Amino acid sequence: MLPSARIEAVIELTAQVAHSLGENGPAADVLVRKYFSSRRYAGSKDRRRVTNLLYDIIRCWGFLSDISGSDPRRMVMAELHLSDDDPKKYFTGDTHAPENFSDAELEFLETVSAGKEEHHRLNYPKWLESKLQDRFGDKFFQEMNALNKRAPLTLRIARDAPKITEYLVDKKIQYEKGIHANSAIIIKDQVQIRDWPIYRNGLVEIQDEAAQLAVKYVELKPGQQVMDLCAGAGGKSLAAAGYMKNKGQIYAFDISENRLKDLKVRARRAKHHIFQSFVLTPKNRSAKLGEFKEKMDRVILDVPCSGSGTWRRNPENRWRLRQESLGEYINIQRSLMKEAWDAVKIGGRVAYMTCSVFKDENESQIEWFLIEHENANLIPIRKQGIEQLEGTLQLSPFSRGTDGFFVAILEKQAIKT
């Protein structure tokens, strides 16, 4: 693709993202995959250039849509202009290139300058300002700038670490070891790993270092009975199986059959065989979970949340979040915490996790739970992140170079009579 054709592709995808944000439709990565699946002539460099520019636009969506009236052409023009890349060389009207500027668009371009309001400069919805400032305090600017950067590709070593490093060195792939989790490898190059033998054969999995560290604090051991109540595609379950050395049982629950199918594929690839998976529905949920009442040594509870800690890799999430949906998440989280508590045995532990930086979803939920359950004891986690409820862990991009992630470990004690 010629450079001007790439810009035309970005305009088309920007329009699709705008529609998707308005209708709560598919995520940007889904739209990009679909777009290029019907354009086989586009090479890997084309896809990378288009995707990178599109995601730069998504990060600044609030500001760009405000100044452009949500017009996709103007949003792309403005992003190019603000990046010191002259848009006039792309908008030529040539074959496969965007049409020439209209007089109105030329006038618009002359008015474009960097955002002056804080929520425009730091790329967050205005209504979230107090929550973000409450969380980050005097590190607000540093943390928000970190959330605006692209996240690196982080891998978890599943097995055979020497083979992994040998492969990376042989392929001249730049990497460094994680700082917080021994299992983490951070890839410095922009790569596609789906065809790597070490990935296809289950030696590595894609997982942010924060999530790897969170599983470490669950203190898993061989032979335990473990429930993953919101398993999804099984990232944390697979990490748990490694700590358990394939001994014991992991019961993976989710409301999505497709996600659990992914877990089964990944488990086979990683040579883990201690999984049982269960699809939960409104009809079977109570009865199915009732079968596990007070039988679990550990419950991993990575609850649905705002995803505010993942804005580096999912920048559109900041624009999808609505005030009412945050309240819904909080109610869902409390319901799931009760279900997890019913499943864990006396002396067992629930590991509450979110990929959020908001106190409403993190410390406030733990404080509520401790008040509601007199037999719940908060097991202290050594402080490694930013300011937080004593005994819990809150990681963030600036403080620790990871996704924003929260962990609290709750131990179930016998009720005193």
Question: What do the PLM-derived regions correspond to, one by one?
Answer:
Residues 187-225:
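SAM-dependent Rossmann-like transferase core, predominantly class I methyltransferases
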Residues 1-194:
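Class I Rossmann-like S-adenosyl-L-methionine
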Residues 233-246:
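Conserved SAM-binding loop of SAM-dependent methyltransferases across substrates and taxa
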Residues 244-245, 344-346:
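Helix-to-beta-strand junctions that scaffold the AdoMet/dcAdoMet cofactor pocket
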Residues 256-294:
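S-adenosyl-L-methionine
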